[in-house]
Amino acid sequence: MKEKKIAYVGFAFLHHKNTKAGYQRIKEYVKYDYIFDCQKYFDRYFKEEKNPVSIFVAKVMSKIFGVKLFPWYIIKIWWKGLFRRDIVFHFVYSESLFLPFPRYIGRNKAVCTVHQPLEVLEKWNMVKPLCKADSIILVGEAELEKFNSVIGKNNVVYIPHGISTDFYHPLDTVKKKRLLLTVGDWLRDFVFANKVYQKLLDMDPVLQIVVVSREKNRHYLTANPRLKFLCGISDEDLRNLYLESSVLFLPLLRYTANNSLLEAGACGCNIIISSDHPDNSYIPSQYVKLVKMDVDKTVSMIMNNHAMTYNMGLVKYIEDNYSWDVIGKKTESFLRSF
C-alpha cells in the first residue's frame, strides 16, 4: 500500500510566537510533505477590530460561516486536495482551524489535534464538526474514553504534547531559592491562587512568589513587595525561573495541554497541582503532588514541600516520554498509517 503524504495546517498563538512553547513546533519534528501556514490569517483574526465597517463585515461573516473572517487558507487546501487523494491533513489546532464544512479536503483525510476538554468544545459548538474528522488526536489521556463515546467512531487516540528538552533542562550555573512559581493562563484559577499566595506570604517571611502569565490576570493578585507579576519574558528568563524555584504551583480549573507542566518537569521542578480533578497531570504521582482546591490544604502542602535540589528522575521521565523527538516520531507514524 502506498504511503500517504502528510500536510501541516497550523499557526502559532500570539503568546507562543518566537518562543519554545506551542504545539505548532511539531512541524520541526514531523517530516511533513506539505506546509499550510495559516499565521497571517490568525494574526488578523485575533486582532481587535475598531473600524465600524470591519466590525459589520465580521458580524456578517460570523452569521454565514461561523467565523469573522473568511478562512482563505481553505482555498489552498481545497486546491491541493482537488487533484490528489493521498493526503492526510493534520489540523494542529483544530478548535480554531477545522471548520463545520470539512468537505474542502476532497477525498483526502483529516486528522484533528484537540487541546481543550470536551465541555469547552461543547460550549464552542465544536463537537459536531469534529465528528466529521477521520481521526482525532487528544493531547491529554483523561477524556479518551469520553471522546470516543461522544464522537462514536472509535477514532480518537492519545498522543501527548511535546516539550523542547534540549532547551528545558537543569543547569549547574543556576541555584535554587525559596521561590514559589506559577506559570500560565488558560484554565488557571487566579482567584484561588491569590488566596494561597497571601496566606503563604503571611506565614513565610522569606518566601518570594513569581507569577508569569498574561497581563489580563494581574488584577487578580493583591499587591505585595514579595509577589512579582511578569508577562512577555524571554524563554531564557522563564527557564531560569523554573530552575531557581523551590516549588512550581499550578492552580488548575480543568486539564488541558500544559506547556508549563512539561517545561517545569523537564527542568526537574518540584511540582504541586491544586485541582478538583485528580487526572490533571501528565506525570505519575511519584513525580508530582496533587491536592484539592482547598486553601488550607494547598498552603500546608506547599509549606511542607519546598525542594532545593532538582528532581532528576522527573527530568529523565519527561525526556523519555515527552521530548519533541519522541512525540514527532509517534505523530508522524500515526499520520502515515492511514
Set out the residue ranges of the language-model regions.
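A short, active-site helix/loop in glycosyltransferases that binds the activated sugar's phosphate group
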Residues: 133-155, 218, 331
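Nucleotide-activated donor-binding/catalytic signature segment of Leloir-type glycosyltransferases, i.e.
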Residues: 215-239
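Conserved donor-binding/catalytic core segment of Leloir-type glycosyltransferases
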Residues: 172-198
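A charged, aromatic-enriched C-terminal amphipathic alpha-helix characteristic of glycosyltransferases
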Residues: 293, 306-337
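Short His-centered aromatic/hydrophobic patch
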Residues: 91-97
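Conserved acidic donor-binding segment of nucleotide-sugar-dependent glycosyltransferases
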Residues: 285-296, 301-307
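Acidic donor-binding loop of glycosyltransferase active sites
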Residues: 243-256, 269-270
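Acidic anion/phosphate-binding donor-loop and adjacent secondary structure
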Residues: 145, 157-177, 338
